[in-house]
């Protein structure tokens, strides 16, 4: 069998048993798989590539087991795998079925022309191209270093020497791909003003008509859950992967004494780049999350428990005492704090409650199983289709909600910041700025950016708008954690 593309797959801890008609010696290959993976040092969830002729290249796939790759986040590993697979597919389909060992500089340049300039190609943006080149370059740097190929097909140029007494000197052999795009970083930041977000949510997610009224023919069983998911994302700035990884232990129940805002800790194990941080949630949104937990979530959990679905989970992690979130893998004697579990492990995490076992993951589907990122992406796609069908010219994706949070929050924080400074004399302003910091840095910390330079893109978005337009697009009704901020300043 021959297909036309390299494919990305994930290493599974267990394989399904072949049919009974398969010879017994073949069935042996599926037994003791978990132990074998540990012996050879393969982590479940590690990506690997399958060739168009369905071959597993042992040498090529060692790249994903190298120290540099194993230290990266799982999503980053799969990003590298997809970008490498795309280049290898190009070699196969457009370069006479050339193998990765035979690729030369001319193949990389042909790939550049097709990806960015060819009228029949995808014409990708500079930032996307740079990401793809980085993945392919990392693979070939590894292949050259360990001796699998003599040279890399990605042409290199020497980095310019740094200047300044406090900057580390670069060595002469430090290089970077010569084909990096110079137009990266100029892409427009897509965001929705609060009013447009509500229209998109009501029409696309809740199934309302264009006039904002409930539509009789809409059968959205999970409209309330999906709308709550979107509201939480647009009001916290969490990434899709981060919000998908939340458990019932991270998100608190709302109580009246929490005030208009409360916060929870996003642990390092699920925060991108290890950017653990406090996440602020409006009380209104947290109340909607509570309603989902009490009704929709509780119903599917009860149905799954009655059907015995959780008892059939293979090798789950179990929290034996919900008051103390420590988990133990079935068959293991070691306990691990839930906050240290990655997304893959959290999807196998059960909580032993008086009613029986139930998943620790916050967001569950109709079968009572944790929802995947792909399921949420399809929810956004379906919502956009409903908007088009209703004649509403709005579309949204998960990261666009993160952009919306950043732009709206930065604009409102700037207004409050300037108003506070205007009422103070110079020494008070200095003290206020030292304690509170500036709005841009506050947004940076909420987004989990390492550098404020990354967050500056949202300041540039606001700089492009006239003040009257900013006041119209970002009304004052979008409440902020002002009381929390004031308490922080007062305590300091």
Residues covered by each model-derived region:
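C-terminal secondary-structure termini that scaffold catalytic or DNA-interacting sites
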Residues: 2-5, 453-456, 467-492
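Long, amphipathic, Lys/Arg-enriched alpha-helical "connector/arm" segment
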Residues: 168-222, 265, 271-273, 284-287, ...
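Short, basic (Lys/Arg/His-rich) helix/loop patches that form interaction surfaces
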Residues: 377-445
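Conserved tyrosine-mediated DNA breakage-rejoining catalytic core shared by Y-recombinases
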Residues: 160-164, 245-352
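Short functional hotspots where side chains directly engage DNA or cofactors
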Residues: 256-259, 265-268, 397, 421-462, ...
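Short, charged phosphate-coordinating catalytic segments
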Residues: 146-150, 233-259
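Basic, Lys/Arg- and aromatic-enriched nucleic-acid-binding interface segment
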Residues: 202-240, 428, 437
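N-terminal core-binding DNA-recognition domain of tyrosine recombinases/integrases
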Residues: 60-76, 84-171, 207-210, 214-217
């Amino acid at each position: 069998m021959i297909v036309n593309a390299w494919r990305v797959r994930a290493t599974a801890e267990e394989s399904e048993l072949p049919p009974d008609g398969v010879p017994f010696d073949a069935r042996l290959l599926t037994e003791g798989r978990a132990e074998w993976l540990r012996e050879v040092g393969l982590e479940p969830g590690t990506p690997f590539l399958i060739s168009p002729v369905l071959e597993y290249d042992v040498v090529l796939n060692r790249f994903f087991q190298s120290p540099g790759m194993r230290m990266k986040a799982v999503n980053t590993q799969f990003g590298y795998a997809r970008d490498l697979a795309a280049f290898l597919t190009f070699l196969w389909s457009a370069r006479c079925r050339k193998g990765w060992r035979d690729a030369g500089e001319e193949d990389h340049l042909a790939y550049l022309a097709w990806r960015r300039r060819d009228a029949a190609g995808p014409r990708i943006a500079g930032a996307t191209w740079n990401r793809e080149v980085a993945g392919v370059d990392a693979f070939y740097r590894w292949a050259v270093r360990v001796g699998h190929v003599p040279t890399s097909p990605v042409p290199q140029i020497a980095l310019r020497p740094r200047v300044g007494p406090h900057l580390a000197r670069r060595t002469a052999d430090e290089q970077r791909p010569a084909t990096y795009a110079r137009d990266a970083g100029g892409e427009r930041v897509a965001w929705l003003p609060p009013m447009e977000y509500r229209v998109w949510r009501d029409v696309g997610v809740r199934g309302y008509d264009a006039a904002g009224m409930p539509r009789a023919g809409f059968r959205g069983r999970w409209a309330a859950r999906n709308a709550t998911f979107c509201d939480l994302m647009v009001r916290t700035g969490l990434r899709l992967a981060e919000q998908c990884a939340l458990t019932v232990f991270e998100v608190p129940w709302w109580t009246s004494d929490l005030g208009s805002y409360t916060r929870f800790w996003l642990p390092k194990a699920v925060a991108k780049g290890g950017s653990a941080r406090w996440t602020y949630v409006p009380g209104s949104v947290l109340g909607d999350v509570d309603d989902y937990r009490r009704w929709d979530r509780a119903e599917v959990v009860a149905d799954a428990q009655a059907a015995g679905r959780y008892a059939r989970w293979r090798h789950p992690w179990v929290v034996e005492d919900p008051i103390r979130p420590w988990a133990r893998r079935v068959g293991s004697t070691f306990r691990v704090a839930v906050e240290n579990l990655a997304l893959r492990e959290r999807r196998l995490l059960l909580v032993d409650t008086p009613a029986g076992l139930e998943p620790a993951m916050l967001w569950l589907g109709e079968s009572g199983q944790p929802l995947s990122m792909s399921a949420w992406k399809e929810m956004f796609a379906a919502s956009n289709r409903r908007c088009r069908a209703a004649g509403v010219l709005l579309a949204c994706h998960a990261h666009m909600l993160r952009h919306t949070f950043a732009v709206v929050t930065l604009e409102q924080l700037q207004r409050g910041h300037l108003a506070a400074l205007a009422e103070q004399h110079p020494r008070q302003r200095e003290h206020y700025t030292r304690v509170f910091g500036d709005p841009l840095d506050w947004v940076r910390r909420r987004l989990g950016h390492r550098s404020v330079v990354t967050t500056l893109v949202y300041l540039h978005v606001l700089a492009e708008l006239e003040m009257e337009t900013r006041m119209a697009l970002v009304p004052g009704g979008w409440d902020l954690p002002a009381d929390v901020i004031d308490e922080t300043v007062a305590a300091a």
